[in-house]
Amino acid sequence: MSERNSAVLELLNEDDVSRTIARIAHQIIEKTALDSKDADRVMLLGIPSGGVPLARRLAEKIEEFSGVSVDTGAVDITLYRDDLRNKPHRALQPTSIPAGGIDNTTVILVDDVLFSGRTIRAALDALRDVGRPNYIQLAVLVDRGHRQLPIRADYVGKNLPTARAEDVSVMLAEIDGRDAVTLTREDSEGDS
């Protein structure tokens, strides 16, 4: 019988995470024409837990680079998940939509990791109950592949091809005390 050991690799450090967020902010400014007077109202809605602080940081960078203030909020997906039987129950998080609602806006959903696409599908269902934006886009810090649904991010900080058994963790200072992206691999003793 073989023993299992975990190897943790740091893929992005604090500086890498900061640069990645800045790059996504520039892409959002360019693609949404935020600095144009004809641009739709844009808001960033984070998916708890990692997407919420990422949305706030993106909004800060967007304002720093373009001078345009972008509303932020959060969309709780707990009741919209299709895997409730398979995962431990999560406490409900508040959904906070900026004043004026999401009708006739460009909503950019923000999450830390895009994996199967099920979290994003749940967020789309939750948004449908809140209003009808003109456009919905997706920004993620890490896209690790392995989609189970036909969902693609509009803004990707880092593409990290992984094995299904590997685990990608995004750590953010607001939640974890530091910024980093790590990959955990399960290795069997004796594997070379």
From Swiss-Prot:
Q: Name one GO molecular function term.
A: uracil phosphoribosyltransferase activity
One GO term (biological process): regulation of DNA-templated transcription
The organism's superkingdom is given as: Bacteria
Q: Does the keyword Hydrolase apply?
A: no
Is Transcription set as a keyword in this record?
yes
Which Enzyme Commission numbers does its entry carry?
2.4.2.9
Q: Where is this motif: PRPP-binding?
A: 107-119
Function text: Regulates the transcription of the pyrimidine nucleotide (pyr) operon in response to exogenous pyrimidines. Also displays a weak uracil phosphoribosyltransferase activity which is not physiologically significant.
PANTHER family for the chain: BIFUNCTIONAL PROTEIN PYRR
Kindly provide the name given to this protein in its UniProt entry. Answer: Bifunctional protein PyrR
> What is the protein's species of origin?
Corynebacterium glutamicum (strain R)
